[in-house]
Amino acid sequence: LGEDFYRAGGVPAVVSQLLKNGLIRGDAMTANGRSIGDNCRGEKIQDEAVIRPFDKPLKAEAGFVVLGGNLFDQAIMKTSVISEEFRSRYLSNPDDPEAFEGRAVVFDGPEEYHRLIDDPALAIDEYTLLFMRGTGAIGYPGSAEVVNMRAPDYLIKRGIHALPCIGDGRQSGTSGTPSILNASPEAAVGGGLALLRSGDRVRIDLRLRRADVL
């Protein structure tokens, strides 16, 4: 699969499509001292069965949404893994469909999360939103896939396995947790997540594509 992607034009071909449609900054500098535009503008797709042109998508609505708000400028949510149980608990209020609010519990990195997630003193319940910050490309060198958070053990025993997870880092692509990831700007450079505190109320609205601390 990786070789097919490379032979079809690879990342430069994808970025060229984004540049052509105004979806990425062409003047952003890269590691080779040239801009993204200089590196990728004009690159061609060699195999449209592997890389589809922007105007010929395989699917008009993909399994992701881009959110913004006062917590971050942009972040990605993988909506294709939202289970019926999760949708029923969070997204089925007829007076406020596709939106939910909850109390934030904030972890400064995966080490703190692993140390504290099962601590009853955090008072995590089924409506809590779990946050992990300091895990972006600058705050956590290597940008490892560490924003994988489960519910505390006492909720799992009650059959509640997934809570909303939000972070400025990455997560394994095999994770089934409904998560908002790659929040930018990240906390390490002064993004909104740096100001968030446990106990703050946060609202997520998938219709408006917003994530805001209240």
Region roles according to the model:
Residues 1-187, 191-214:
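Catalytic or ion-coupling anion/metal-binding cores of large enzyme and transporter domains
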